[in-house]
Swiss-Prot record:
Localization, UniProt: Cytoplasm, Cytoskeleton
Any one Gene Ontology cellular component term annotated for this protein: cytoplasm
Binding site for GTP: 11, 71, 140, 144-145, 179, 206, 228
Modification note: Acetylation of alpha chains at Lys-40 stabilizes microtubules and affects affinity and processivity of microtubule motors. This modification has a role in multiple cellular functions, ranging from cell motility, cell cycle progression or cell differentiation to intracellular trafficking and signaling.
Species this chain originates from: Euplotes vannus
SUPFAM superfamilies: Tubulin C-terminal domain-like, Tubulin nucleotide-binding domain-like
Necessary cofactors: Mg(2+)
Protein name: Tubulin alpha chain
Active site per UniProt: 254
Binding site for Mg(2+): 71
Positions carrying N6-acetyllysine: 40
GO biological process: microtubule-based process
Subunit structure of this chain's protein: Dimer of alpha and beta chains. A typical microtubule is a hollow water-filled tube with an outer diameter of 25 nm and an inner diameter of 15 nM. Alpha-beta heterodimers associate head-to-tail to form protofilaments running lengthwise along the microtubule wall with the beta-tubulin subunit facing the microtubule plus end conferring a structural polarity. Microtubules usually have 13 protofilaments but different protofilament numbers can be found in some organisms and specialized cells.
Length: 450
């Protein structure tokens, strides 16, 4: 089996995780107590969903996941919530004091006390796997736990499981919506280690997802539950090929191979379509071409940046439901002819996966049940916009050394700030260089021909 272990860190990571496991359970017909009436093989079984769930002798399905937070509230919600029987109590780990939006607390003082316990639990899950494929991390980098403990865990996982791939779903601070003043510090410090210790990081940002909920689902004031359920659809589409048997299946390592041209350039943009409310879906069933086009719209992007300002280096489209390769090829061909969607000249660009399992929606949720959906995850130079925005905010505060004493007081050195900031400046430069026309001399002749 090619198992995957999910690691949910901090409030953001756990709440996105909640939405994901809720959706996975629905997709596989697993009840909140872990029973799965449709599953006839008791025990390990070689069913595809066993990549994400392990089976006990009693026929209970337990997510291969660890949920960690430095303060107990969010974990307690799970311990008392609908899915309280789904997780093994040891998989939910909570500390007693908060990281208080402080990277240094999550990474040095408080995180250090809990990290060995977490790694021990992960080791138990790993021992339970026959062929561990890798890890999927869920966290946000604005707060203290997701950024600090998140980076610490990723660093330690690199040491313990060097060759296993690590895919991260990372919620970045939004341009307008801010939950903490020190978000830029935490994000920059955290990205510094994401650069080294993850293979692929999918960037999400609350504001972009808010706008999608508001615009496409007519939700006037979206809650985190609305946002997380939409994000869960993206994560579900990306992992569907690991959890179901399909025609064109995609492995975690395959994402990496197809999306990352250079090790540092591994921050991905994602989008999902169709996002329509139940009332609208009643009147329209969207074709493959339509959902493909909509997934390239700047408004569909789950991070605030405009792909029209950048070039695509690679693009992975995961279709699910009633989709045949012929339609996909036609849709992709149309995309390639569009002038607004530019690829770098050294990369042909598309990888496609098809999974015949139709998309599932949470009953009573906002999303409509549709026949087919697509999730696009792409590597575009436009994502540098996200970094430059955060870097700019970082610079404004750091020039005055505002709030820095909180970090230094928790055992960080001021040098780490400038080191992380320089690393990000280098990353912005890397993105710039990748986008510049590579084959010089050839470009001019092509212009003449046009």
């Amino acid at each position: 089996m090619r198992e995957v272990i999910s690691v949910h860190i901090g409030q953001g990571g756990i709440q996105v995780g909640n939405a994901c496991w809720e959706l996975f359970c629905l997709e596989h017909g697993i009840q909140p107590d872990g029973q799965m009436p449709s599953d006839k093989t008791i025990g390990g079984g070689d069913d595809a969903f066993n990549t994400f769930f392990s089976e006990t002798g009693a026929g209970k399905h337990v997510p291969r996941a660890v949920l960690v937070d430095l303060e107990p509230t969010v974990c307690d919600e799970i311990r008392t919530g609908t899915y309280r029987q789904l997780f093994h109590p040891e998989q939910i780990i909570s500390g007693k004091e908060d990281a208080a939006n402080n990277f240094a607390r999550g990474h040095y003082t408080i995180g250090k006390e809990i990290v060995d316990l977490v790694l021990d639990r992960i080791r138990k899950l790993a021992d339970n796997c026959t062929g561990l494929q890798g890890f999927i991390g869920f966290h946000s980098v604005g707060g203290g736990t997701g950024s600090g403990l998140g980076s610490l865990l990723l660093e330690r996982l690199s040491v313990d499981y060097g060759k296993k791939s690590k895919l991260c779903f990372t919620v970045y601070p939004s341009p307008q919506v801010s939950t903490a003043v020190v978000e830029p510090y935490n994000s920059v410090l955290s990205t510094h280690s994401l650069l080294e210790h993850t293979d692929v990081a999918v960037m999400l940002d609350n504001e972009a997802v808010y706008d999608i909920c508001r615009r496409n689902l007519d939700i006037e004031r979206p809650t985190y539950t609305n946002l997380n359920r939409l994000i869960a659809q993206v994560i579900s589409s990306l992992t569907a090929s690991l959890r179901f048997d399909g025609a064109l299946n995609v492995d975690i390592t395959e994402f990496q191979t197809n999306l990352v041209p250079y090790p540092r350039i591994h921050f991905m943009l994602s989008s999902y379509g169709p996002v329509i409310s139940a009332e609208k879906a009643y009147h329209e069933q969207l074709s493959v071409a339509e959902i493909t086009n909509s997934s390239f719209e700047p408004a569909s992007m789950m991070a605030k940046c405009d792909p029209r300002h950048g070039k695509y280096m690679a693009c992975c489209m995961m279709f699910r439901g009633d989709v045949v390769p012929k339609d996909v090829n036609a849709a992709v061909a149309t995309i390639k002819t569009k002038r607004t969607i530019q690829f770098v000249d050294w990369s042909p660009g598309f990888k496609v996966g098809i999974n015949y399992q139709p998309p599932t929606v949470v009953p009573g949720g906002d999303l409509a049940k549709v026949m087919r959906a697509v999730c696009m995850i792409s590597n575009s130079t436009a994502i540098a916009e996200v970094f430059s925005r955060i870097d700019h905010k970082f610079d404004l505060m750091y020039a005055k050394r505002a709030f820095v004493h909180w970090y230094v007081g928790e055992g960080m050195e001021e040098g780490e700030f400038s080191e992380a900031r320089e690393d990000l400046a280098a990353l912005e430069k890397d993105y710039e260089e990748v986008g510049i026309e590579t084959a010089e001399g050839e470009g001019e002749e092509e212009d003449m021909a046009q």
